């Protein structure tokens, strides 16, 4: 073997010298001496008669046997009890990062098992600095006992930081399956090859395959002008230095290796001498530019050879390309005989042809489209192969925008656009046209006076240019392609609204006025009356101010007879986007009677591309497509903005699409296409410490708890969903399950799954439990339950015993829940879950979510009073206890605030004293300025979206106000003042949805934004919510208790309609007039409704003007964080309550009628 390796080295060196010459070896180039036929498994045939080198995954029995596929021996695997158990082999130190390997083994079942699930999976376990990963090599290959089955696949090693563990193991979804394995072979896939990585270097095929023009430039293979042969590549339409011919080298280059570049260039128009060079663009976490050669002088009319070289630093690159540029931004030039010679990467990208076609999965719902670049639409490019396999609609990412089609006035260039149309026709695809009008990527000449570019064009001239452009573009495709024209709709106008919902202050608006929008639609309809016409925009899926603005604009346009057929929702979302907001936005806009198309879908990872983030992304993609399917009556297309992560427009690092940078299916693909093959992310929710009472009335303490949402469908796409709140004490896990279900049936029900030790086992252990609760209250007898129906569905109050595990703060309990919905057909039509959307909860706890046992709720107090809103700290604020911002979302130091809260019958008052030594408001975005944001959820529903009662109020240090979402800002008041240490913000927030009273608890949070001297936001800190999503999600707000309204201010004539016959009428009216008790509404007291002993205690303190005191822990059923704890302490010290020795029984009930006596 040593002689063979030496011979191989000599032959490779000789070949390299013949190609490059001896000078190649200064600097030296890497040469591998690996024999690519070497099996990395040293004992893969077991002919040693041992299992040396093999280890156990789990605890199976491994033994050598004479039942063989080759030779005399094989390995027999028995004694399995878990699906993941089997033989394993370590490859740590044997495999190289970035290298691809072929994996093959032979498998046969031990006879006599009669398994109903005889499947084999081969998995690589990998642990690096980013955690533990399970990479599938072969997924559930069927095997038999009748013959040996070859199980084969490929594996490419990738990892982050240090690789700590790497081993391959053979498993089966049948936990007791027994089998033999033999002839295990793992080898590197490809030997080293050296050559030209440019496939179309001479253009003698007469096409531009692999080449594109960057920017506005257009490339074309031309006959009759060539350095050799008959063809060369001509570049025209350049408007910037960097515009020019570009070739994609992604997957073809080995970082760390030198590549020699050689090409010929010629021009015929321009100066006598021009300067030209080649540059490599390599994208990792940012775009890197590597110069191939200095600018070379090229003489007009002469073919000139240009040489250079480059070496990419070792890194992970999502995109690599080489392009030619000139210092003359409009120079047209030819190139020919282009070579980039060096080691050809073994990591050539191939797509997965054995997975479902994406568009076929949704063929009964809507077409699935993708934005493309014409350079990647040659059949040899794996991007084109991926496009053809998975999509049945195309849109041009840039090639149909104004600057691409008409870079100079009257000169239309359709070459790149036509390439996309031709590809669509050849592959039986439809197209969306994008876009006829935009404020970006439109040439300046559109807006300039032709005689003086420093002056603006007139309204009439700009309208004429707009009409000419729209008419020419639509007529081109209609005339050239006729009945074959695949374009079924156009984005007529794009992004005409700004972030605040106003018409964007573009040059179109400035010169023409707001009617430019309707004019564009009129011109398009006139040019092609059969074409569907769309208005397209971003951030209209948030159900906020921009959604409303789009609704109002389209409603107005339709009322004026403008021919608008649909709304394009770009849907550039992120992994924290709210599915309820997206649903509400779709339905709101669709109510206008227009089509809805999702036009630019991707999901920003916000810089986090960890495995956990990718699984979280998968869940949201699944929820999103379930929603799209449920809304299929409105949605007529769903289009992704890019085919794979390597071509995303988003800044790196990012992974926003269904296919990764190597064009392989991501977890999100499987979550959308076949959730049974997905790996769910593990969600986490907090259970707050507390002991709620279970009974006819829902305990008021539940108001303080953030819910989790049971809204991921595993059956159907429309049906019952739920919110779940959790609390705990040393005896029970308490659940409040509120089910939304408008099709009542006794077959409806809840299933609760609990893994007390949270060990995430793949089968049930003795600590694991499944409980059932029917809508009629029947079900598991070993838990406490109370079920009631209401107009929205039904509510279950549950207590699940956990005393046996001695629960403590920060412990975790594995948890999942399933909501079953029978819509009246006698069967379960829809099922939603919280965590495991593979729906394997009945047998597998590994995909349960986590319930974290946490301390009691965060709650602050606002006292009754009416300060003057003047930005000054009046004396009235002196008696208010402050709270502080100390929950960091961005950064870990910077501006912070202490804040105090007061209230009266009209307003909530907030005083924020901000410490900030460097004040800045230069950013155009209000949220990036030095400012204070107050978040209020008046009904404290803690929803993941904003309801009408919710608000986001922002005030910067200069008293400039701004508001988020659908905030009702009417009546809002603020004042600010500068201090030696920063600034003060004082606000009055009007009550719009509730009548406040003593004991009311609202959702509340406060955030401080900190800008640096350049206007960049560098710090965000809140009082409570750590998520950073308070602007769209109220579920993380803290709690604010309203107290202190005096009883002495008499209200005359107080009475209620429902106490006329009550024996306690007189007492109720007297106490209500003194604010000691309050009506449930202005006209209803509800005398028979119960109150808790805690609520009654608070009322008594108000009656006697007794101040609350810090709770000292006298009672076992009162926790220091409970809203009533300090009231209980004051009443206990005053002798008003005694308890029963250990318990105060704060949640025991009395009627509102009884408490007045």
UniProtKB/Swiss-Prot annotation:
Residue ranges constituting the SLH domain according to the UniProt record: 1051-1114, 1115-1157
Pathway note: Glycan degradation; xylan degradation
Gene Ontology molecular function: carbohydrate binding; endo-1,4-beta-xylanase activity
Gene Ontology biological process terms, A to Z: xylan catabolic process
Domain GH10: 352-675
EC number from the UniProt entry: 3.2.1.8
Temperature dependence: Optimum temperature is 70 degrees Celsius.
Effect after changing residue 602 to N: Loss of activity
Stated role: Endo-acting enzyme that randomly cleaves the internal xylosidic linkages of the xylan backbone, yielding xylooligosaccharides of various lengths which are further hydrolyzed to xylose molecules by beta-xylosidase (EC 3.2.1.37). Requires at least three xylose residues for catalytic activity. Does not have activity against xylobiose.
Protein name: Endo-1,4-beta-xylanase A
Organism: Thermoanaerobacterium saccharolyticum
Gene (UniProt): xynA
């Amino acid at each position: 073997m040593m002689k063979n390796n030496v011979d191989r080295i000599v032959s490779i060196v000789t070949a390299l010298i013949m190609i490059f010459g001896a000078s190649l070896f200064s600097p030296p180039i890497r040469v591998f001496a690996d024999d690519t036929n070497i099996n990395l498994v040293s004992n893969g045939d077991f002919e040693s008669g041992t299992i040396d080198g093999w280890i156990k995954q789990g605890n199976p029995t491994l033994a050598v046997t004479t039942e063989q596929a080759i030779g005399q021996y094989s390995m027999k695997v028995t004694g399995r009890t878990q699906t993941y158990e089997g033989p394993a082999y370590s490859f740590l130190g044997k495999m190289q990062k970035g290298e691809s390997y072929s994996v093959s083994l032979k498998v046969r079942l031990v006879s006599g098992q009669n398994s109903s699930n005889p499947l084999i999976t081969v998995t690589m376990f990998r642990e690096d600095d980013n955690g533990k990963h399970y990479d599938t090599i072969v997924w559930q290959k069927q095997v038999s006992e009748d013959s040996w089955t070859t199980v084969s696949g490929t594996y490419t090693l990738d990892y982050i930081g240090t690789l700590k563990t790497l081993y391959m193991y053979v498993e089966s979804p049948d936990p007791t399956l027994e089998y033999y394995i033999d002839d295990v072979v793992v080898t590197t896939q490809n030997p080293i090859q050296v050559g030209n990585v440019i496939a179309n270097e001479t253009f003698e095929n007469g096409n531009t395959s692999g080449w594109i023009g960057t920017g506005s430039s257009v490339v074309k293979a031309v006959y009759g002008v060539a350095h050799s042969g008959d063809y060369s590549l001509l570049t025209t339409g350049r408007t910037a230095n960097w515009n020019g011919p570009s070739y994609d080298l992604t997957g073809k280059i080995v970082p760390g290796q030198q590549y020699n570049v050689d090409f010929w260039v010629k021009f015929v128009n321009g100066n006598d001498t021009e300067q030209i060079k080649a540059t490599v663009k390599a994208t990792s976490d940012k775009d890197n530019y590597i110069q191939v050669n200095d600018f070379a002088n090229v003489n007009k009319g002469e073919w000139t050879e240009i040489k250079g070289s480059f070496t990419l630093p070792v890194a992970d690159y999502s995109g690599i390309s080489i392009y030619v540029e000139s210092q003359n931004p409009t120079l047209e030039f030819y190139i020919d005989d282009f070579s980039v010679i060096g080691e050809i990467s073994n990591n050539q990208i191939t797509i997965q042809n054995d997975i479902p076609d994406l568009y076929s999965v949704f063929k009964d719902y809507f077409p699935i489209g993708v934005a493309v670049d014409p350079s990647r639409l040659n059949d040899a490019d794996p991007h084109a192969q991926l496009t053809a396999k998975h999509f049945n609609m195309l849109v041009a990412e840039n090639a149909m925008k104004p600057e691409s089609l008409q870079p100079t006035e009257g000169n239309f260039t359709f070459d790149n656009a036509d390439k996309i149309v031709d590809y669509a026709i050849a592959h039986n695809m439809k197209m969306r046209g994008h876009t006829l009008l935009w404020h970006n990527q439109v040439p300046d000449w559109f807006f300039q006076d032709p005689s003086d570019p420093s002056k603006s064009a007139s309204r009439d001239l700009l309208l004429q240019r707009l009409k000419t452009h729209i008419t020419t573009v639509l007529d081109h495709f209609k005339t050239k392609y006729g009945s074959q024209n695949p374009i079924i709709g156009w984005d007529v106008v794009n992004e005409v609204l700004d972030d605040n919902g106003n018409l964007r202050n573009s040059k179109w608006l400035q010169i023409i006025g707001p009617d430019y929008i309707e004019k564009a639609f009129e011109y398009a309809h006139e040019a092609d009356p059969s074409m569907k016409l769309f208005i397209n925009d971003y951030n209209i899926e948030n159900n906020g101010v921009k959604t409303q603005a789009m609704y109002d604009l389209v409603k107005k346009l339709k009322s004026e007879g403008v021919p608008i057929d649909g709304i394009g929702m770009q849907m550039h979302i992120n992994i924290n986007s709210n599915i309820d907001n997206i649903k509400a936005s779709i339905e709101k806009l669709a109510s206008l009677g227009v089509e809805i198309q999702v036009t630019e879908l991707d999901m920003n990872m916000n810089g986090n591309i960890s495995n956990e983030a990718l699984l979280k992304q998968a869940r949201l993609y699944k929820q999103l497509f379930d929603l799209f399917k449920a809304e299929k009556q409105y949605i007529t297309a769903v289009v992704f903005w890019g085919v794979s992560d390597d071509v995303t427009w988003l800044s790196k690092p990012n992974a926003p699409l269904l296919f990764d940078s190597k064009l392989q299916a991501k977890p999100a693909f499987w979550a959308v296409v076949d959730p049974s093959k997905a790996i769910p992310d593990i969600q986490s929710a907090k259970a707050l410490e507390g002991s709620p009472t279970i009974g006819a009335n829902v305990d008021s303490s539940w108001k303080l708890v953030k819910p989790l949402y049971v809204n991921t469908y595993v059956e159907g796409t429309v049906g019952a969903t739920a919110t779940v709140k959790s609390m705990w004490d040393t005896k029970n896990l308490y659940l409040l399950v509120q089910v939304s279900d408008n099709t009542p049936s006794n077959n409806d029900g809840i299933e609760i799954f609990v893994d007390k030790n949270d060990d995430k086992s793949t089968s049930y252990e003795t600590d694991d439990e499944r409980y059932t609760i029917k809508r009629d209250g029947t079900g598991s007898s070993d838990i406490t339950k109370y079920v009631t129906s209401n107009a929205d569905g039904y509510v279950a109050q549950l207590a699940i015993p956990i005393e046996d595990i001695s629960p403590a703060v920060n412990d975790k309990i594995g948890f999942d829940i399933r909501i079953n919905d029978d819509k009246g057909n006698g069967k379960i039509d829809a099922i939603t879950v919280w965590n495991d959307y593979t729906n394997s909860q009945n047998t597998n706890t590994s995909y349960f979510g986590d319930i974290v046992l946490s301390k009691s709720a965060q709650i602050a107090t606002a006292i009754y009073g009416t300060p003057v809103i003047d930005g000054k700290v009046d004396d009235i604020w002196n008696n208010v206890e402050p709270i502080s911002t100390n929950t960091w979302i961005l950064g870990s130091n910077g501006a912070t605030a202490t804040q105090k809260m007061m209230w009266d019958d009209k307003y909530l008052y907030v005083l924020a004293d901000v410490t900030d030594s460097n004040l800045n408001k230069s950013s155009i975005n209000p949220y990036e300025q030095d400012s204070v944001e107050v978040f209020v959820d008046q009904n404290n529903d803690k929803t993941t979206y904003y309801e009408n009662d919710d608000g986001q109020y922002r005030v910067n240090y200069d008293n400039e106000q701004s508001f988020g979402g659908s905030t009702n800002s009417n009546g809002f008041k603020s004042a600010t003042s500068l201090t030696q240490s920063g600034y003060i913000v004082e606000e009055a927030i009007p009550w719009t949805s509730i009548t406040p009273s003593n004991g009311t608890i609202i959702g509340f949070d406060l955030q401080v934004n900190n800008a640096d001297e350049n206007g960049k936001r560098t710090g965000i800190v809140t009082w409570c919510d750590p998520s950073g999503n308070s602007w769209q999600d109220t579920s993380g707000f803290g709690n604010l208790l309203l107290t202190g309204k005096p009883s002495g201010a008499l209200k005359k004539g107080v009475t209620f309609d429902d106490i006329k016959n009550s024996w306690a009428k007189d007492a109720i009216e007297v106490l209500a007039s003194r604010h000691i008790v309050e009506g449930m509404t202005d006209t209803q007291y509800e005398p028979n409704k119960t109150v808790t002993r805690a609520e009654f205690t608070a009322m008594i303190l108000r009656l006697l003007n007794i101040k609350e005191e810090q709770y000292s822990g006298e009672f076992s059923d009162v926790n220091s964080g409970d809203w009533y704890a300090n009231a209980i302490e004051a009443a206990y010290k005053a002798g008003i309550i005694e308890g029963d020795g250990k318990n105060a029984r704060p949640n025991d009930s009395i009627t509102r009628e009884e408490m007045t006596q």
